[in-house]
């Protein structure tokens, strides 16, 4: 039997401090998170090709807009998770898929995601298909301080989802640029 000298608290510290101090560790943790997110999607029978297309398009827009909107690498991870998981609620209900997506994400542990991160991904997944300030019965509650980030992520995923509405991945090339304060999307199929 081999016993390590590490305590539980050492593991928790490594989980939270490691990514900030060690780039190799951060890359490995991100790889593990992405693998887990794909496993969650597969568990709920998501459309892999559509999810990856929405991810690709949303991240292309994020990469161009992030600096001007004050969004960092961690926000990029949240956009990526939202893009990949935005439709998992269809496993339960096609009609109310966004609500079930919210509930499934909230009830799932995602390595390296705080409860707040999970809530942001769940809310952005919900609002990718619903009006942000629509006060429908059964809508999840959102804290005021989360609204700006959730709105930005939901908008990116909503637009990326609309660009693959056919679920056929017709857009092969997507270039995003900013001109005179306007976002231009050049897409080729």
What are these regions (language model features)?
Residues 16, 83, 187:
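Flexible glycine-/small-residue-rich
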Residues 4-36, 51-52, 58-59, 118-131:
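Glycine-rich phosphate-binding/hydrolytic loop that grips phosphoryl groups
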Residues 38-41, 50, 56-177:
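Divalent metal-dependent catalytic cores for phosphoryl transfer on phosphate-bearing substrates
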Residues 181-188:
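Short, aliphatic-rich beta-strand segments
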């Amino acid at each position: 039997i081999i016993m390590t000298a590490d305590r539980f608290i050492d593991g928790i510290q490594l989980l939270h401090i490691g990514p900030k101090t060690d780039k190799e560790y951060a890359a490995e943790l991100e790889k593990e998170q992405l693998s887990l997110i794909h496993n969650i999607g597969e568990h709920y029978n998501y459309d892999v090709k559509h999810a990856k297309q929405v991810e690709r398009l949303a991240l292309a827009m994020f990469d161009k807009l992030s600096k001007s909107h004050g969004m960092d690498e961690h926000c990029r991870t949240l956009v990526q998770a939202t893009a990949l998981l935005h439709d998992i609620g269809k496993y339960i209900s096609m009609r109310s898929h966004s609500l079930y997506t919210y509930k499934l994400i909230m009830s799932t542990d995602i390595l390296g995601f705080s409860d707040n991160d999970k809530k942001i991904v769940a809310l952005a997944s919900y609002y990718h298909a619903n009006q942000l300030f629509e006060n429908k019965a059964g809508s999840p509650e959102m804290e005021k301080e989360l609204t700006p980030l959730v709105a930005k992520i939901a908008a990116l995923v909503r637009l990326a989802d609309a660009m693959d509405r056919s679920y056929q991945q017709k857009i092969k090339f997507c270039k995003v640029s900013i001109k005179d304060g306007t976002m231009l999307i050049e897409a080729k199929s």
